[in-house]
Amino acid sequence: MYFIDEAINEIKAGNGGNGVVSFRKEKYVPLGGPDGGNGGKGGSIFFIGEQSENNLLKLKYQKHLKAKNGENGKNKNKHGANAENIYIKVPLGTIIYNLQNEITGEILKHGEILTIAKGGRGGKGNKSLATFKNPVPKYAEKGGIGESFKIKTELKILADVGLIGYPSVGKSTLISIISDAKPKIADYPFTTLKPYLGMVYVDNESFIVADLPGLIPNAHLGKGMGIKFLKHIERCRILIHMCDMSKSNPLQDIENLNQELKIYNKNLLKKPQIIIANKMDIIGAKTKLIELQKKILNKNIIPTSLLKNQNLKILKYKMLEMIKKNVVNLPLCENSSFKTYTLEEEKPDFVIKKDNQGFFVVKGEKIEKFFYKTDFNNEEATKKFAIFLKKIGVEEELIKKGVYFSKNKIKICDRVFEFIT
């Protein structure tokens, strides 16, 4: 199976069902009154965190995510059924962006639910619209429009420990020994083509280790697996830097790989590292280890031989110890663009601007909501919309801008109106 960690999807929540205009018609009930039911709510779309998911394959090949519309209301005060919501399981570490590359949400915990798009509210039938002043309304509301937009999703794997190193240093073998992960293992470069997650158990505690594909020089430029997998390192609490003691210069390999991390994101070097000096059963490895320990001060260096299971228990306890010391070392959305609204930033009810065609264009969140639930084929509903505009001051502002004298037309959403006093 391919490892997919990015996807772009078109999202469309369901529209609300329309309310209905209906009147009770029964024998011996001369004043039956309105009995039109409300429309059902449109389906919403949610992402839910699932720890067993490990990539975005479902989202990659399901380009369009569309929820159903709510049912229309019926007579005899019968309400339309709400549409079913859509719940999509995504792996932990999934980040959601809008097309402006602003982060709009992320999934970090198993079972965590994130609202992606809200369904439209159901329109009210004339039974619900009856008031003391208007006990027999001859209109009903249309259902609200469900949210619709494109999103980009990106997966940055959540793991306590990230295994890094050049190809064929033994990362996949290590994770298969110390955890329940079973990656494919062979003695040639780029064996690991996708990250593997394994659960490691130490006494009564456990933690997650990620086997990340091997890096090569200029990985930050996209060479080899490149940036595609460097980003997954950002979410690991600590790093296990594995080097091959059978190579001629293990120290140079360590320095080169750290340079790749630095160029990609200098904050990666701030993460705690354990250096595993692997293949200590090779002739000459002990001499190289002594040189390594002289050059790298204040570093946790653990010599191992996966062939002989040397020091693996010590390694597991050391990883657990460092994880506990670095509980807060999990970067979330460092470059997020969440918008914070204050009382000073409160938006006006509407704005009016003149476009190139000479139309007075009226915009406002409240106006748009009222517009989309109004049935303009119904005279009474249209009249109610006009009263609403007058009540919030649109008519007065239009007169100030000269619409009465210039006889310009007014545009609200996708509809053009004439100004009549």
Curated annotation (Swiss-Prot):
Q: Does the keyword tRNA-binding apply?
A: no
Report the protein name in the record: GTPase Obg
Source species? Phytoplasma mali (strain AT)
- InterPro entries (alphabetical): G_OBG (IPR031167), GTP-bd (IPR006073), GTP-bd_Obg/CgtA (IPR014100), GTP-bd_prot_GTP1/OBG_C_sf (IPR036346), GTP1-OBG_CS (IPR006074), GTP1_OBG_dom (IPR006169), GTP1_OBG_dom_sf (IPR036726), OBG_GTPase (IPR045086)
Question: Which UniProt keywords are present, listed alphabetically?
Answer: Cytoplasm, GTP-binding, Hydrolase, Magnesium, Metal-binding, Nucleotide-binding
- List the CDD domains hit by this protein, alphabetically: Obg
Record's Gene Ontology CC terms?
Answer: cytoplasm
- Outline the extent of the OBG-type G domain: 159-324
